[in-house]
């Protein structure tokens, strides 16, 4: 695949493992309660995908963000992206780890591209709508929001690789013909 010496047979195990990491990152982003955004000092206001909390010290007043349609859309899109990602992971295990089924690889790539599109939409809607409706000063995006972007970037990379792998079917399956370089003269 690349001239720098990547072994094709290792791709059979690396790609599902990368998808597993993307799933874990997505779960962390979706389940995080500490917030996707927090105020500048992280002392008076923070908001996760599900709720926003205001207060000081240990006295926090939390309200659900699910009353906003944009927050419901973000939650739905992130969960749909996670479900598509899990489905693609299961298919990749079947396609690559038991027997190499190269015909499934472009389908997995398309599923992953769909998951990327859905999650990018969610990750863009959240800060735009948060700034329009809740913004009260300077906010920082936290590690949980970063995990959402990390999962999306990993998924995009895997999608590209899954779309490119069918070109290297003989190398992946180990049926590559030996190429001899010689000069006649």
Curated annotation (Swiss-Prot):
InterPro entries for the chain: P53_induced, PMP22/EMP/MP20/Claudin
Regulation: induction: Induced by UV irradiation of early stage embryos, this is partially dependent on the presence of tp53. Induced by tp53 expression from 10 hpf onwards.
Record's keyword terms, sorted: Apoptosis, Cell adhesion, Cell junction, Cell membrane, Cytoplasm, Membrane, Transmembrane, Transmembrane helix
GO CC annotations on file: cell-cell junction; cytoplasm; desmosome; plasma membrane
Main location: other
One Pfam family it belongs to: PMP22_Claudin
Record's subcellular location: Cell junction, Desmosome; Cell membrane; Cytoplasm
Transmembrane segments: 13-33, 74-94, 105-125, 143-163
Topological type in the membrane: Multi-pass membrane protein
The keyword Cell membrane belongs to this UniProt entry's keyword annotation: yes
An individual GO BP term: cell-cell adhesion
The keyword Transmembrane helix is assigned to this record: yes
Gene3D superfamilies to which the protein is assigned, alphabetical: 1.20.140.150
Knockout or disruption consequences: Morpholino knockdown embryos show a decrease in apoptosis in response to UV irradiation during late blastula stage embryos (4 hpf). Gastrulation continues normally, however embryos show increased levels of apoptosis at the end of gastrulation at 10 hpf and develop a severely malformed body shape from 24 hpf onwards when cells in the skin and fin folds appear rounded. Significant increase in apoptosis of cells in the skin, pectoral fins and notochord at 30 and 36 hpf.
Role of this protein: Component of intercellular desmosome junctions. Positively regulates apoptosis in the early-stage embryo in response to UV irradiation, this is partially dependent on tp53 activation. Required for the survival of cell populations in the developing notochord and skin, therefore required for normal embryogenesis beyond 30 hpf. Acts as a positive regulator of endothelial cell apoptosis in response to blood flow-derived shear stress.
Family from the record: Belongs to the TMEM47 family.
The name this protein goes by in its record: p53 apoptosis effector related to PMP-22
